[in-house]
Amino acid sequence: TAIISSLILFIIFFCSFFVELITPYNPFDPSSLSLMEAFTPPSWTEDGLSKFILGTDGQGRDMLSTILYGSRISLIVGFSAIIFSLILGVGLGLTAGYFGGKYEMFVMRLTDVQLTVPSILMALLVDGIARGLISREMHDEMAIYVLIFAIGISEWPQFARVSRAATLVEKNKDYVSASTIIGVSNLVIMFKHILPNILRPILVIGTIG
């Protein structure tokens, strides 16, 4: 099962990032528009054309090419957003769990507040703020980056809560106490000793995300 799943993921990634080798059509190229071939059915139907395997849309663009080019953007945005939220959430959760006190209380209350807001609503809110702060032309140019930030900022609380809980368990173990006694800095203890031991649940959440 794992091998089959990995093979399917490899095919998806290959087709998405090497789409130019698979199909000659670029849906973003205005010259690819052909209203005469609009709404062409898939190639296996009676009126289908062999050059359009999945048919065309209302503007005559090849549907297979549109899906593949779109999947590339979706994968880039998805992975970048998860990495951003992972770095932010783990950083806050790890430091909150390690130092504790008012800082931990502040971070956890912040996660509680944000978890009351649906992720999609938070992403739309961030995008709306971005539209108000920058010009429309700049927003169009930075649309992908704004989307990555909007999704990432809405997903970090789950990483923060898990990493904080795991850090609370790890920081009371003997290897952390030994490192503290011999004078190892807090930064080294957190990111070199504790972080590798709490990565497993974090990576599981990241994979699901």
Predicted regions and their residues:
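Transmembrane alpha-helices
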Residues: R72-L88, L187-G209
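Short helix-to-coil transition segments within interhelical loops
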Residues: T56-R61, Y98-F99, A178-V188, K192-P196
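Gly/Trp-centered helix-boundary motif
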Residues: T1-V90, T95, K102, T116, ...
